[in-house]
Design a protein with these regions (language model features):
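Strand-loop microenvironment adjacent to phosphate/nucleotide-handling motifs in alpha/beta enzyme folds
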Residues: 32, 62-82, 87-267
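Short, small-residue-biased leader/transition segments that mark boundaries at the very start
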Residues: 1-5, 174
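Conserved Rossmann-fold NAD(P)-dependent oxidoreductase catalytic core, especially the SDR/UDP-sugar
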Residues: 6-61, 66-68, 75
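Glycine-rich nucleotide phosphate-binding loop and flanking beta-alpha elements
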Residues: 3, 45, 84
Length: 267
């Protein structure tokens, strides 16, 4: 995921073409060929995004929700965070760095992230597709956020190689200290599953989405990545500069403990 994030941050037009226009094309094809259901898997980076990946994913959510107004297909989107052990996640990276004798590299020791296991993610995404109503944006309860520094220290301790150093490399462009997933609890409705919530987010009219897509298409055709990034800020109003969000978060957000979240599942 880190490599994908970095590539998209450095290639804004490519990210817009792939994520935004790619989603629009898939929605169009679903309508054309009579698909029954369309479920988008989104990310916590779409909440008040500070990077290109998050902003394009937020635009994708808006496209999917808007399509539900007049479309024949049942549309929904599900948002969740990092998956432990998946390709590109920090655990395989830290494991390799420990095996190589270190150091473990962190962009910032204050970074906090949500995690779930691959089985948890698979189960909840599939279930959210079943319970979602047309046009809904669902949010998964990822449990308590985990401090990446604690995760690194625990992995070093478990490996028995206590001489491994941890080195800060500095935040990457667009990187947040803390990913917002559940937004505000008062903005969420419960579902049949205690771990899945509905966000109270009204879809934009079809014409508004078409205008946003037109604006993005025009600027992308010019071939200027910075102009495309600025246009992305216009069409995704919640797209913030990372320094704004990181300054707000600062030292305020601390997980209650450094253990992995334990969740109770419904039978």
């Amino acid at each position: 995921l880190g490599d994908v994030y970095k590539r998209q941050e450095n290639n804004c037009i490519e990210a817009i073409n792939n994520n935004v226009f790619g989603t629009a094309v898939v929605v169009e094809m679903c309508e054309k060929y009579g698909a029954e259901r369309f479920m988008m898997v989104s990310t916590d980076k779409a909440v008040n995004p500070t990077n290109v990946m998050g902003a394009t994913k937020r635009m994708c959510e808006m496209i999917v929700q808007s399509a539900s107004i007049n479309g024949k297909v049942k549309y929904s989107a599900t948002r969740f965070g990092n998956v432990l052990g998946s390709a590109g996640s920090v655990i395989p990276l830290f494991k390799r760095q420990i095996q190589n004798g270190g150091p473990i590299t962190l962009t910032d020791k204050r970074i906090i992230r949500y995690f779930m296991t691959i089985p948890e993610a698979s189960q909840l995404v599939l279930e959210s597709g079943v319970i979602a109503h047309n046009g809904e944006l669902l949010v998964l309860d990822m449990g308590k956020p985990i401090k990446i520094l604690d995760l690194a220290e625990n992995m070093i301790h478990l490996s028995g190689a206590n001489n491994i150093k941890i080195v800060e490399t500095g935040l990457r462009p667009g990187e947040k200290l803390y990913e917002e997933l559940l937004v505000k609890t008062e903005e969420l409705d419960k579902t049949e599953n205690d771990l899945i919530f509905r966000e109270k987010d009204k879809p934009l009219p079809t014409e508004a989405i078409r205008e946003k897509l037109r604006m993005l298409k025009d600027v992308c055709e010019n071939g200027d990545d910075e102009q495309a990034r600025e246009m992305l800020r216009k069409v995704v109003p919640t797209f913030k500069r990372p320094e704004e969000v990181n300054q707000e978060v600062g030292e305020e957000v601390e997980p209650e403990d450094n253990s992995l979240p334990q969740r109770k599942r419904k039978d």
